[in-house]
């Protein structure tokens, strides 16, 4: 479930978006939370805040005021990584942040374009990468062009566009 609290109606633990994950195929229901908790101990990586939630729902959509709470079971609440999440973790809330839907470090010149390009198609772009931060895609495009330019040594590309320590820790995790 994704619960959005209305603007100017307050927050829950500093969050307006509350994500509740069930993990029905994971019998123990704790691996996802364990992974986030383990990441907290690695300063070179970012981890989202999580907690277990035992969810009860009272459905009053039919107008019945005497509905009973129904036990929906155990969920993991995971912090939403968005502009607020970036700020909460000491990062630039106006920085580039993308949710990867389908991505392989290809340039995809027909889709990944600057927003002011007349042929820019937001829906096509977000089919690959959902924009969760700044809509300025210049850094993304520069990095993709460098990664796909085989005349540039990969060490140069890594040094210019990536944090080697971060990548090393991520691969080790």
Question: What does each of the following model-derived ranges do?
Answer:
Residues 1-173:
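Phosphate/dinucleotide-binding and metal-coordinating scaffold of catalytic cores
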């Amino acid at each position: 479930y994704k619960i959005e609290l209305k603007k100017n109606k307050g927050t829950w633990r500093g969050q307006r978006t509350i994500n509740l994950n069930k993990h029905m195929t994971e019998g123990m229901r704790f691996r996802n939370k364990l992974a986030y908790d383990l990441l907290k101990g690695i300063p070179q990586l970012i981890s989202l805040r999580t907690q277990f939630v035992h969810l009860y729902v009272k459905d009053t959509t039919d107008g019945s005021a005497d509905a009973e709470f129904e036990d929906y079971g155990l969920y993991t609440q995971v912090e939403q990584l968005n502009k607020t999440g970036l700020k909460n973790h000491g990062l630039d809330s106006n920085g580039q942040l993308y949710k990867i839907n389908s991505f392989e470090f290809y340039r995809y010149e027909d889709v990944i374009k600057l927003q002011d390009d007349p042929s820019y198609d937001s829906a096509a772009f977000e089919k690959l990468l959902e924009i969760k931060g700044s809509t300025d895609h210049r850094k993304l495009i520069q990095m993709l062009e460098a990664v796909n330019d085989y005349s540039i040594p990969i060490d140069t590309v890594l040094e210019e566009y990536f944090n080697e320590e971060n990548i090393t820790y991520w691969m080790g995790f």
